[in-house]
A protein has these predicted regions:
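Extended, helix-rich architectural segments
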Residues: 1-366, 485, 491-492, 681-685
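Extended, charged amphipathic alpha-helical segments
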Residues: 326-328, 337-517
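Long, highly charged low-complexity segments enriched in Glu/Asp and Lys/Arg with interspersed Ser/Thr
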Residues: 607-650
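Extended amphipathic alpha-helical segments with heptad-repeat/coiled-coil character used for oligomerization
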Residues: 217-220, 231, 518-617
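Conserved structured core elements
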Residues: 178, 182, 198, 406-409, ...
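Generic, well-ordered alpha-helical scaffold segments in large soluble proteins
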Residues: 187, 191-194, 219, 415-429, ...
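Long, low-complexity, intrinsically disordered segments
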Residues: 661-685
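Short, glycine/acidic-rich hinge or "gate" loops at secondary-structure transitions
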Residues: 199-207, 225-226, 435-441, 505-520, ...
């Protein structure tokens, strides 16, 4: 019929399907754009080179795990079994690693105070505003002296007053700055406690002594699930789970770090981190700012069939970590790669970053890109003020110019092999020499006689020697025991492992110490000498881990925390090497100093504030509640002001009242007046 039009009616399912098809098509078109393919291709090239360069390091790390677990390499097992005999493995490496871990944890974690501190930055010169304030204080001080003495101070006195005013002002500023630094320290300690610093650092120490390098990542802002408490309408306390954003820290598995080939430090080139993510973790990124929701949904639909990871290394690592049959777990995992490095501005603009963030398309920008398979799920700039990556790295022994260093398993690898060989030979020799070797003349043994079993009081049936020889039919030969020589070899090379690793046996409780170690003072000297080796490792931790991580957390607080009372210029001090000194000795010296200064002369010099500062350090060393034992500087100052006001008020109340006087200036009548008058005239009352 002419002029009629038809309206097509579709249901909600059809509309949803059409929208999904349109969204998938748009995503495919965007991901297939040359720039996106270029970004993925660039990352793939970087990844392939980094993965290839790390293969020797991966084999070294797998060997270190086997060495700690007491397992031979596959080729060594074949050689031993071809020869026959014992497959015993002496756990020298494991003992040294555990001793080193315990020693480092005792130095860095078990001191009652963090292995770092914050101090206010020294002020070399005053700003113009502060100089004006000093001049004003100086003028007031001079005016007061003129009013008191009726004359101006001499030029030398003026210069001395000016210097004193400047020093007092600088001291006041430093005290205020140190108060801010102390508040910042408390804030960072709380953030470390909430962000998992201690647990991460504990795992980091295990990596440090085992692998060629160890890593810590942070601060990384994540959503934290915490418990809160509130009072309901009935006055009862109820629990409430809340989500808050906060900085977190984590130990990064060295197997999952892939640096750019040829670099020495993390900041020298790009870096990949491998994130195995379950479907739930990946889906939780939907809606998070910076992530591409459509790309994530597409990856979830496709699955993890486009992984770039070498599964052989993953399987071997899982077996060494006792994660048997991990490949059979029903939970699907996606291999996400986090890239930190330079990316061209053109790629970032085409991805979706604004021109305000990327003003020049021709420049290279520090970026953070996440890729799963062939899909980029995140591409943002690195917003660190210095463009640094959120990683820190160090090694047990560092090699100049190399990214990867050495761990204890690598250091004593040869010595572990010799100890194993000596132990295998010892066990084999003990087995052979434990009984006699039996020689039997079969021509003189009856056919039904069992010659494979020996027992006490066994009777052997034999025949005469056909040739008339007088030699016995059965002869016993006792093999020699070489246990003494083999034990000497083992002990020699195990002692060499002490020297090479820097972890002597007496550090972890071996009482069989010869020479100077037999006395307490001699053992103390040996412990001090052994500490020189571990001190170098502690210095690496101080400079490469503790100081940069604390500094990054400080910068984060300066940028994002709203509390202005904690903000100020500070210097981060790492104290791990200082903590290596004997803590008891340091505290004893502090107590001796307190006793030596407990006299009026020294108290006038150091004052109550100085003595309180020493008491605080002594209380910290004794792991006492410092704030409950010694008042803080603020509280002590407040108490001093209150006491001063109370003393002034008491003196004012005790001051004698003015005596009433007559017009001629004499006291008014009465007994007291007469007494005063008589005293004035010199006569007795």
């Amino acid at each position: 019929m002419a002029g009629l039009t038809f309206l097509r009616v579709v249901n909600n399912d059809q509309i949803a399907r059409q929208e999904k098809e349109s969204s998938d098509k748009a995503l495919a078109e965007r991901q297939n754009q040359p720039v996106i393919l270029g970004l993925v291709g660039y990352l793939r090239n970087c990844w392939d080179v980094a993965q290839m360069a790390k293969r020797p390091i991966e084999q070294e790390m797998l060997k270190a795990l086997r060495q700690r677990n007491g397992e031979y390499e596959a080729d060594k097992v074949r050689q031993i079994r071809n020869q026959g005999g014992s497959e015993i493995y002496m756990m020298v490496t494991e003992v040294k690693c555990r001793a080193a871990e315990s020693w480092l944890r005792d130095i860095m974690l078990d001191n009652g105070s963090p292995p770092w501190d914050l101090e206010a930055s020294p002020i070399p010169e005053l700003s113009p505003t502060q100089t004006k304030e000093v001049q004003g204080i100086f003028a007031e001080r001079v005016l007061k002296l003129v009013q008191e003495y009726g004359k101006a101070p001499s030029p030398d006195e003026m210069e001395e007053i000016k210097e004193m005013v400047g020093q007092d002002y600088r001291f006041y500023i430093l005290r205020a700055a140190q108060t801010r630094a102390d508040r910042m320290k408390v804030k960072i300690q709380d953030q470390f406690a909430q962000g998992g610093w201690e647990l991460s650092f504990n795992d980091f120490i295990t990596d440090l002594v085992t692998f060629p390098a160890a890593f810590i990542k942070g601060p990384v802002v994540r959503r934290q699930r915490t418990l809160g408490w509130k009072i309901n309408s009935a006055g009862q306390t109820t629990v409430e789970a809340t989500d808050v954003l906060g900085p977190e820290y984590e130990r990064v598995d060295p197997f999952r770090i892939y640096p750019e080939p040829g670099v020495t430090t993390i900041e020298d080139g790009y870096l990949f981190e491998h994130h195995p993510m379950t479907r739930m973790k990946l889906s939780d990124l939907i809606g998070v700012p910076g992530y591409d929701e459509e790309a994530i949904r597409k990856v979830l639909d496709i699955g993890n069939g486009q992984s770039w990871i070498n599964e052989d290394v993953e399987l071997q690592k899982d077996e060494e970590e006792r994660k048997f049959y991990a490949y059979m777990r029903p939970t699907e995992e996606f291999d996400a790669l986090e890239f930190w490095g330079k990316v061209s501005g053109k790629m970032l603009i085409e991805w979706g970053l604004s021109e305000d963030e990327v003003p020049d398309a021709a420049r290279e920008y520090d970026a953070n890109v996440w890729v799963v398979g062939n899909y980029v799920i995140k591409a943002v700039l690195n917003y660190d003020p210095l463009g640094e990556k959120p990683y820190a790295k160090t090694s047990f022994i560092k090699a100049p110019g190399a990214f990867w260093g050495k761990g204890i398993p690598k250091i004593i690898e040869d010595l572990q092999g010799v100890c194993n060989a000596a132990a295998r030979a010892l066990v084999n020799n003990m087995g052979i020499s434990s009984g006699p070797q039996v020689e039997v003349n079969l021509e003189r043994i009856p056919p039904n006689e069992d010659i494979t079993q020996l027992s006490p009081w066994k009777i052997w049936q034999v025949t005469n020697d056909p040739v008339g020889s007088s030699a016995p039919a059965i002869r016993f030969t006792q093999p020699d025991s070489r246990a003494t020589e083999l034990m000497a070899v083992y002990e020699k090379f195990s002692r060499l492992a002490d020297d090479h690793s820097g972890i002597p046996a007496y550090v972890y409780g071996d009482l069989n110490v010869q020479g100077a170690g037999r006395t307490s003072s001699g053992l103390s000297m040996l412990m001090g000498a052994a500490g020189k080796g571990i001190r170098q490792v502690v210095m690496y931790i101080d400079t490469d881990i503790v100081k940069p991580v604390v500094l990054r957390q400080f910068v984060y607080n300066m940028r994002y925390v709203e509390d202005e009372s904690i903000k100020g210029d500070v210097v981060v001090l790492a104290k791990g090497a200082i903590n290596l000194a004997v803590k008891e000795t340091v505290n004893i010296r502090r107590i001796e100093f307190l006793n030596a200064t407990a006299n009026p002369v020294d108290m006038e010099i150091i004052g109550k504030d100085g003595r309180a500062a020493i008491l605080r350090e002594v209380a910290k060393g004794l792991q006492m509640p410092v704030d409950e034992v010694v008042p803080s500087r603020e509280k002590s100052g407040y108490q001093g002001r209150v006491q001063s006001r109370a003393a002034a008020a008491a003196q004012q109340q005790q001051a004698p009242a003015d005596t009433p006087e007559l017009p001629n200036g004499a006291p008014k009548g009465g007994m007291e007046a007469n007494t005063v008058q008589n005293r004035t005239s010199g006569r007795a009352a």
